[in-house]
Each structure stands twice: as C-alpha cells, then as structure tokens.
C-alpha cells in the first residue's frame, strides 16, 4: 500500500531580510515565488496547504487551502508545521519553504525511501553539505511533541528533530535544489540561474 502524502508550503514569516515583502508573493521571472514551489511539488503529493499569516486572500488565489498559525506572534516555521499537522490525515506531511523554486522533482520519493529504509519518523533533506531544516517529510503524529517543544520557548526546527528518529536524505546530485531567497540580491542571482 502506498503512503498518502500531503504538503505544506511555509509562507508565514515576516521576511525581514526582504524588507518585509511577503516572500511567497515576490515575483521571480514573472511568477510569484510560491508558484514555482507549487509547480515543483504538486505532482509529488495529494494535497497542498499554504501556511500564511498575511495576504491570505492572495495566497488563496493559487487554489489551495490557506492556513494561518494557531499560535500568534510569528513564532517561526514550527508554528506553521504544527498548524498543518493538525489539518491533515495523511501518512506523511512534506514541509517546504515558499522561497525554494528549484526543489527536486524527485523530492518526495527519495525522502520517503530514506524514511522507509531506516524506519525513521522524519527525513530531512540535505544538499550534500548542509541539512535543510525546513525541508522535511514527517509523520503528523509528531504534532504533540512539536507543540510542546514550541510552547517551551524553543524555535529551532533542527533542535526538535534531533530528538526523534530522523534520517538525512541527500540531494548532493542537485546542489542548487535548495537555493532560497532571503534578500533582493539573492533573488536577482536566482532569476539568472533559472534562465540558464
């Protein structure tokens, strides 16, 4: 029996380094950043949720359910993950940021294979050099653990997942897959890379 996998795209941050612009809606090569992300993951999952804490109406125009953090105060990616984990009945939830327009087209199958090979609860993607703490495949049943971690004042995703049985899924063969956009300068460099 194949596993059912849903996804959440995290677009709930304040994007301070982008001058406060909503990163998911910033245009890259004529399309909103999040549209690039949607196009990469849509064929790999059953349902997509968009986690947004502002501009929810604009995000809804992409045709997917928009969810806002159940914890107020822009508490970071953990808050978005917790909310999404409570909105899915899938076997696994794929977590990706809204500003990674080059995500692997084989992201889900490789992360799922890594989980199954190790009988792990969580797979975290790696570019071969660094783990990508907000590119995860995890079991929604871990929600209570994550919620307790956040409510204890913790914010770092990697500090949470190291407490669980996790496996690293390497994408060293796609070193640019997780390039993201945090500044206008990075956006310009990425726009050039996409057109090459």
Swiss-Prot record:
Its EC number is 2.7.7.77. It is found in: Cytoplasm. GO terms for cellular component: cytoplasm. One of its GO terms (molecular function) is GTP binding. Mg(2+) binds at residue 99. GTP binds at residues 10-12, 23, 51, 69, 99. It catalyses: Mo-molybdopterin + GTP + H(+) = Mo-molybdopterin guanine dinucleotide + diphosphate. One of its GO terms (biological process) is bis(molybdopterin guanine dinucleotide)molybdenum biosynthetic process. It comes from the Bacteria. Its cofactor is Mg(2+). Keywords: Cytoplasm, GTP-binding, Magnesium, Metal-binding, Molybdenum cofactor biosynthesis, Nucleotide-binding, Transferase. It holds the Pfam family NTP_transf_3. PANTHER family: MOLYBDENUM COFACTOR GUANYLYLTRANSFERASE. Belongs to the MobA family. Monomer. Transfers a GMP moiety from GTP to Mo-molybdopterin (Mo-MPT) cofactor (Moco or molybdenum cofactor) to form Mo-molybdopterin guanine dinucleotide (Mo-MGD) cofactor. The N-terminal domain determines nucleotide recognition and specific binding, while the C-terminal domain determines the specific binding to the target protein. This is Molybdenum cofactor guanylyltransferase.
């Amino acid at each position: 029996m194949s596993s059912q996998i849903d996804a959440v795209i995290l677009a709930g941050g304040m994007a301070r380094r982008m001058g406060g612009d909503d990163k998911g809606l910033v245009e890259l090569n004529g399309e909103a950043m999040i549209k690039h992300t949607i196009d990469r993951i849509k064929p790999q999952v059953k349902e997509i949720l968009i986690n947004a804490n502002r501009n929810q109406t604009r995000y809804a125009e992409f045709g997917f359910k928009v969810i806002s953090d159940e914890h107020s105060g822009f508490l970071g990616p953990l808050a978005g993950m917790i909310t999404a984990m409570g909105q899915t009945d899938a076997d696994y939830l794929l977590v990706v940021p809204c500003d990674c327009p080059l995500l692997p087209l084989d992201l889900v199958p490789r992360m799922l294979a890594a989980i199954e090979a190790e009988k792990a609860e969580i797979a975290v993607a790696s570019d071969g050099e660094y783990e990508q703490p907000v590119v995860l495949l995890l079991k929604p049943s871990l929600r209570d653990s994550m919620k307790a971690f956040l409510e204890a004042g913790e914010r770092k995703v990697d500090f949470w997942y190291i407490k669980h049985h996790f496996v690293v899924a390497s994408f060293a063969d796609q070193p640019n897959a997780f390039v993201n956009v945090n500044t206008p300068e990075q956006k310009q460099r990425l726009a050039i890379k996409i057109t090459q």
